[in-house]
Structures are given as structure tokens and as C-alpha cells.
Amino acid sequence: MSESFKKSTVREYFESIVIAVILALFIRTFVVQAFKIPTGSMEENLLIGDHLLVNKFVFGPTAARLERAVLPVGTIRRGDVIVFKYPEEPSRDFIKRVIGLPGETLELRDKKVSINGQPLDESYVHFLEPPGTSSEFREVTSYDVRERYGPVTVPPNQYFVMGDNRDNSQDSRYWGFLPRDYIKGRALVIYWSYDDGLGDYHEESTGEALKGLGSVFVHFFTRTRWDRMLHQIR
């Protein structure tokens, strides 16, 4: 085998690796993101330990009419389950459902949402049972925003988002409207669901993270929620 052939082969391997890395980074940055459900704020639709794929391209900007016609992009609609940067701590990602759109007037009375004076049909909503069960995210306010909020008008280029588990969700009722620029993408599908038994979100040390990986290795088949695999998110 000639020296030039060896160099050519090594170069081809190197170029293939570089291209693969660039492609993976492009997909991760602009197209798809993996996301794990850390809390119960979206129950019963999304459970702690659900691993999702998030379509980041669907809300991406498009410059031309032809691109809008050909590429799978879209506008943000009421009912979309979205992943976004938490406005009060942008390094963290949250997941909620879009309820109020720009320009709409939203009001919450007795836990029922109205948009522009019309009751909203929300079959996906879940409430804590029995009544009076404590909520991790409940805050002390002049009135309980879980029961009553507004009316408020959603500003331009902002959205009002809420968790499906209305009594246990830190959402727009507590921290306000969500700017359009903070939205990263639409939740697409559950590719894996694992019940680690840890409950709601908590900070992990390096040791706990390694212990968690070991637990997944041991309990993968028994704790994986097989019936939730490839479940489309609505």
C-alpha cells in the first residue's frame, strides 16, 4: 500500500468525522433538541422522566415566501406544547402549553380560562386531588392565582403559557408573559420514558448523576414506560 494512499484514506476518515460533527451540531442547534421532563407541571399528559424530541426548526424565521411554502415551519398556536428559556433564569429550559396569544385578553375565574370573554375548552387540564393538596410552586399572594387571575391583555410578540397540571405549575400566572425570542421549539414526540422514582426536579451532584446512570443500567427494562414510547405530544 503506497504512502499516498494511506494519507488519502486518513484524510477521508478525518473529513467524514468533521462533517458528521458539524452536521450533528447543526441538527442540535437548529433542528432538534432532546429534553427531559423534570417536574409534574404537565401531568397527566407528560410525566416526570419522559424524554422528548423538540422541533426547533418549526418556529424558525424564514426569509422568503418560497421557503414558507416548502419548509416545515409554522406559527405558534394556542395549545402548542413548547420548550422555552425560563425568563427569570434563561439558563434553564421550561415546558408549558401556549394559552394566550398576542393581543388576546385572558382571564382566569374559578380555575377556568376565558379568552376574549369566551370560555376555553381545555380537555388536557389536570388539577390536584383531593382539593387542598399542597403545591410545590404555590406562592403567597394577595389572592390565589391558581383560582383567579386577570383580566390581562397579552402584549405583542409575547405569550401566556400554563402547565397542564394547573395546581402545581410555575407559569405565566407567577412570572408574567413569555417573550417570543425565548421560545426554542415545539415538543414533538416522547422517544423514551423512564420512571426513576426521584419525583420533582432537584439539583444533582456529580456522584448522584453517576449513581443515576448506574440505576438506569440496572433497571432499564423494568422502569422504562414502554407504552409511552413514540407517543406524539398534543
Predicted features along the sequence, with ranges:
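Soluble "head" domains of membrane/secretory-pathway proteins
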Residues: 2-11, 26, 30-36, 41-234
